[in-house]
Amino acid sequence: MAVKALFADQRTDGGFAPSWAPNYSSLDATCFRLTQAEQIGVSGSEAALVRTVRFLTQRQRLDGSWEEDETVAATAPVWAQPGNMAARLYLTANCGFWMATYGGVDSAIRAADYLRNHLEPDGRLPSFLHTHWLAAGLWHRLGHGGLSRRVLSCLAARLPDMTAGNLTWLLTTLLSSGVPASDSLVQAASSMLERYQNPDGHWTSDDGPEYDVHCTLEALRVLSLTSTTSTWKGPLN
């Protein structure tokens, strides 16, 4: 029933519509739905998920990147803005990560190559913070440890700037891509996330109070995955 509910509003092309364009299949909204699918353990062979992956495959550009259609430029948020390099790199890292996760290896490799061409020597990408951990997760999953490590070193210096939402997304991405729980960045991020827990046990979402429950569940999930080496002992009483 949970799987059916998750994909109930899937569009005929396999994608999902965002709040900012209700009649359009968005790459960003579709990747978020794949995030939710992974959270509840949807099988890669699930028919609706296969259609979702096919949608992303068909929307990939010839150079290996992904970008929202220019027809939604007037309403798309900055992270999905067509024609913007930062948004293109973010969507390429996000789509590429999920293609690698659900078996679209050829598409994932093309995305990884596109991102590599924009990686700066110090491990930065000319894009948003979350682009970095998505790219690192993609490269790690594909066996490009050197590229992944460069980005992770860059992210280590940015940890003090991260919110609870940032940290849960970073940890979820890295752990699901195979970065071990004992990794120094994973441990540092986990420790920071512990400190962000509010006295009543919840974590505050970047997206407003209505998303605090989701943020809290994700924080609990990632901390349970790092608990063998983390000092976390569970939610406060």
Model region roles, listed by residue range:
Residues 1-237:
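Preference for long, amphipathic alpha-helical scaffolds in soluble/luminal domains
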